[in-house]
Amino acid sequence: MKKILYCFGAIVLLTACTKKTQKIESNDPVTSTVTNSTQTDFSGLYNYQQNGDTITLQVTVDGTKANGNLMYALNEKDRNSGSFVGEIKDGVLLANYTFSSEGILSERQIAFKLTDTSAIEGYGEVEEINGKMVFKDPTNLEYDKGLVLTKK
């Protein structure tokens, strides 16, 4: 009788251990959490303030989609501010910027190279399409001439 009880106890113990092992092995949220934490979060406030010039870029990111607000207050130039909607690909925000300057509503394309600490505006040849200024070749923009906005 004791042998049967020992065998039954051993089976219960092994079954309990097997179930616990299966639970741990099938728990994938840990893997996805690690993967997501290595991606750069570009959401936040980027700011430049120097020599009477102020540029503020507020970015909200959802996957590859991005939106936010942008304000230019450059010394001795007209202030413009508005909102943008676009996408982030390979650390570059490419978006349509709708803004108001001197009471006139306009739209143009903007590009910023984003890092976890800064944003630099991209420059390149533009053309007007349907009343909106867009980059001729968004993949061939220069970022070395832009002002560096620091992430706050």
Language-model features: locations:
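Beta-sheet ligand-binding and adhesion/scaffold domains
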Residues: 50-52, 65-67, 93-152
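Bacterial signal peptide processing site
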Residues: 17-20
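N-terminal, intrinsically disordered, polar/charged segments of Gram-positive cell-envelope systems
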Residues: 23-38
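Tryptophan-anchored aromatic micro-motifs
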Residues: 34-53
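A structural detector for short beta-strand units
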Residues: 53-57, 82-84, 108-110
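N-terminal beta-strand/beta-hairpin edge segment
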Residues: 82-83, 92-94
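N-terminal glycine/threonine-rich, aromatic-flanked beta-hairpin/loop signature
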Residues: 59-87
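Sec-dependent bacterial lipoprotein signal peptides
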Residues: 1-15
